[in-house]
Design a protein with these regions (language model features):
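Conserved short-loop catalytic and cofactor-binding motifs
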Residues: 62-66, 111, 133
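Long, charged alpha-helical interface segments
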Residues: 116-153
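Active-site-proximal, substrate-binding regions of enzyme catalytic domains
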Residues: 1-85, 91-94, 98-103, 125, ...
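Long, charge-dense
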Residues: 107, 112-119
Length: 153
């Protein structure tokens, strides 16, 4: 499976030392130039994450005015490359990507997939680590993801 990612999932996974999960979950991970720039202060992108130049931007004022450069370029690149998944955490960006016919997954979905594939032993410690770094997870979503992972007590 191929993926295009925005900045925030890469930064979040790097902060909890789980960026390598992307290599285990996807055959290729691609980011647009804006994501490479946005992540540069925090994440040294490994060689297996490809920075791919955009040939066109989504011709939509909504995308350009409502989202940051990383989200706008990630959505545009996904429309161009048609990956299996576009990795986005921002809810409005996720809604737009889905409206445009893209298959979206976020950081929690990635961790859930990793748990289901046996790549991590438990989801709760990873989610708690995310929260400790300042990553916001609504309590209802936290519980829902634990239910899906079979870890809610």
């Amino acid at each position: 499976m191929r993926a295009v990612s925005n900045s925030s999932p890469l930064i979040a996974l790097e902060k909890i030392h789980q960026l390598e999960l992307l290599r285990d979950l996807f055959s290729s991970v691609t980011v647009p130039p804006a994501v490479a720039r946005e992540t540069a202060p925090t994440v040294k992108l490994p060689s297996w994450i490809e920075v791919y130049p955009l040939t066109s931007m989504v011709d939509s004022r909504t995308v350009r005015s409502s989202f940051g450069p990383g989200e706008s370029e990630a959505i545009s690149l996904s429309l161009e490359l048609r990956p299996d998944r576009v990795i986005l955490d921002d809810e409005p960006a996720r809604r737009l990507a889905q409206k445009l016919g893209l298959n979206v997954i976020g950081t929690l979905g990635l961790l859930l997939s990793a748990k289901r594939r046996g790549l991590i032993p438990g989801l709760r410690p990873q989610m708690d680590a995310l929260v400790a770094t300042g990553f916001f997870i609504a309590l209802e979503l936290y519980d829902q993801v634990l239910d899906l992972a079979g870890e809610r007590s």
